[in-house]
Structures are given as structure tokens and as C-alpha cells.
Amino acid sequence: MSSNGFINNNVERIIKKFDSRDPFDICAGMGIRIRYKDLGTALKAYYFYQSRIKNIVINARSSRAVRRMLCAHELGHAVLHGELAAMRGFQEIELFDMSIPTEYEANMFAAELIISDEDLMELLNEQDKSFFSIAKELSVPAELLDFKFRIMNNKGLCIESPYTAQADFLKKDIPCCFNCTMQ
């Protein structure tokens, strides 16, 4: 399993290289093809490597805000687990299952990419901000904010999350209620 430091260093390097936290911009810069396909209700997104081409497929049924999170998660697989995907190809596994280390790592990557330390600290320092209002303001679901809190704890900041992400949160329906302006 990749260490948190390894994940954080990869995210920092990518942000610096592409001068962006937007997973779609980063994928374009890295030559990763993004496709939208109706994947039904069981599958949200997946990453695969074929003929020396990196690909991310995102369920066309997902809202724009959810697509951003899914793209960041799959980008995490491309960056952290690209060799594994090249060796095995795409396998139907329990996607986003936290008991599988690669899924946990991809969620940590997505949280670190999408939520900057500075933005989070600024919101945490504002009075009368709840965990859920911060998640909404950052346009992320509470689960992704919980992952960011874990990262911040690993960086030495003691921030307790009042919410613990369920193991399969990305596997379930993700309503756009965390920020309905990003439809």
C-alpha cells in the first residue's frame, strides 16, 4: 500500500506541473482519455490501460460535481496504480471498496487533489462552520472531506471528523446535494 506521504508527494508534483487541481485539466495534460458512457446504476467509473493509452470511463448518468470526484479518484488509480492496471487489465472488483488498499489510496488521492489545505484551514477557522457546511462550500461529499481530515491528521494537524466515511460511499448513489450549483 502506498504511504500517505507518497500519495501527497504525487499530488503536489502533479498540481505544480499542471498548475491546476482540476482532474479533467490534469488528465488532458497527461494524455489520459476521458469517456462518458451509460454504465447503468452499478458502476460509477473505472480506469484502464490499453494499447499504451490510459483511459477513464465515467458514468454519463453522474452529475458534473460527482464526475469531478470520480475523475479525481480514477486519476489516482492512473498515477498510483498504473503499472498494476497495465499488468492485469480491468477486472471487475468491488470498486471503491475500502478493504482493497488501492481504493483507499485512490480516495486519499482524490481528497488531496480536490481540497487544498489552505482552503480547508480557512473554512475551519471561520466561526459557525459545520463539517457539512464546509463540505458543501468545497463542493464535495462529506465522505471526501473525512478523507481530507485523515490526511491533515497525518500531516500533524489534529482535526477530528464528526463523520466517518462508509467503506462503499462511492459505490452508492451520490446525490448532488453537497452543492447543487455544480450540476
Predicted regions and their residues:
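Active-site hotspot residues in diverse enzymes, especially metal/ion-binding acidic/histidine motifs
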Residues: 1-183
